[in-house]
Amino acid sequence: VPIQKVQDDTKTLIKTIVTRISDISHTQSVSSKQKVTGLDFIPGLHPILTLSKMDQTLAVYQQILTSMPSRNMIQISNDLENLRDLLHVLAFSKSCHLPWASGLETLDSLGGVLEASGYSTEVVALSRLQGSLQDMLWQLDLSPGC
């Protein structure tokens, strides 16, 4: 498979996930920069310059989304898994050794946070994920390093 096709597929999947998030109407009601107490484990918006950092960020989001009860999260989590697979193919094409990122070491507190504020967690996570994906889309055009 030509690597340009993999890169194009990666960008298309990112756009699809961003659209899925946009289709979940309540995600528009919060700024991704908004500080929400207790949700510091959700990655914020910061430049994601390398393929390994992209994979690491997606692993954390995937871990957060799979612990949420909403049906919408299952599809987005599956999309993130596929996106991570594509990033690994891109990394391999650049002779990068990309270890499979595992997300956060401790998300034990997530259960309590979800019980207390599941809706807020979902809104903030999706909003920040959308911003991170848009950043990744931009970075892919710059041919990110390992």
Curated annotation (Swiss-Prot):
Disulfide bonds join 96-146. Keywords: Disulfide bond, Obesity, Secreted. GO terms for cellular component: extracellular space. InterPro entries: 4_helix_cytokine-like_core, Leptin. Signal peptide: none annotated. It is found in: Secreted. GO terms for molecular function: hormone activity; peptide hormone receptor binding. One of its GO terms (biological process) is T cell differentiation. The keyword Disulfide bond applies. Key player in the regulation of energy balance and body weight control. Once released into the circulation, has central and peripheral effects by binding LEPR, found in many tissues, which results in the activation of several major signaling pathways. In the hypothalamus, acts as an appetite-regulating factor that induces a decrease in food intake and an increase in energy consumption by inducing anorexinogenic factors and suppressing orexigenic neuropeptides, also regulates bone mass and secretion of hypothalamo-pituitary-adrenal hormones. Belongs to the leptin family. This is Leptin. The lineage of its organism: Eukaryota, Metazoa, Chordata, Craniata, Vertebrata.
